Amino acid sequence: MSDKSNVEERIKKAKELKQSLESKLEKVKGTPREEEFQLQIDKLNDLIAHLESEL
């Protein structure tokens, strides 16, 4: 597997996880867990941006 396709696969998985977390975030809005989910989503956004910059 080439480096580029490996990075693309990691981006795809990160975006899928982000989408899952965003749907869970909607369910915990207004609860103490909301901040926890938002932090995870923010970290995934950073990871996705970093990976895309490597392409």
What is each PLM-predicted segment?
Residues 4-7:
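Repeat-based scaffolding regions
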Residues 10-55:
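Short, charge-rich amphipathic interface segments used for partner binding and complex assembly
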